[in-house]
């Protein structure tokens, strides 16, 4: 089994990975948003502890438990205590870019989680490369959302202007439920 620990945007990235891969891998993925790992965690479990700051108490607590259990462990953070623990224990660590708001780091976290699953032999590299393709597309597409782009050519501005003073309701298929 696979356990991804995290709060806020880190948990959101885990939920997206879980949905993205639910028909691709046979191992169950559980997202843990608290201090304690489930009793099902064993030496055969892959525990990925994620915290943008690297200092989230809940994620560090779960990481410490995973190390004590002897689970397979990887970490994701921009810096902080989590990175220090990973270095000290020779644990695989993916370093996220610094200087972002944690929610803005979700896409980086998502990519890190999928790459860890590739490195542990759980996910195919082709599926990870698919993410890179979408990231390139979104990078180019988002240029049209810049403040300097006129309203006529900027769908983000048009949506914002249309939505002003209204309540937003987001509907989604289950595939996109973590994003809704």
What feature does the model see in each segment?
Residues 1, 149-162:
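A short, well-structured juxtamembrane/interface segment
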């Amino acid at each position: 089994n696979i356990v991804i620990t995290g709060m806020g945007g880190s948990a959101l990235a885990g939920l997206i990975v879980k949905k993205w891969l639910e028909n691709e891998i046979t191992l169950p993925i559980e997202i843990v948003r608290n201090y304690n790992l489930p009793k099902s965690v064993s030496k055969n479990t892959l525990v990925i502890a994620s915290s943008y700051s690297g200092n989230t108490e809940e994620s560090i607590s779960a990481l410490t438990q995973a190390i004590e259990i002897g689970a397979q462990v990887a970490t994701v953070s921009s810096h902080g205590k989590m990175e220090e623990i990973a270095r000290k224990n020779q644990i695989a660590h993916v370093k996220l870019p610094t200087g972002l708001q944690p929610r803005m780091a979700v896409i980086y976290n998502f990519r890190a989680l999928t790459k860890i699953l590739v490195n542990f032999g759980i996910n195919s590299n082709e599926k990870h490369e698919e993410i890179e393709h979408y990231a390139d597309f979104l990078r180019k597409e988002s240029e049209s959302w810049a403040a300097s782009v006129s309203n006529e050519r900027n769908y983000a501005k048009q949506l914002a202007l249309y939505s002003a003073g209204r309540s937003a309701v987001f509907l989604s298929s289950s595939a996109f439920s973590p994003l809704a």
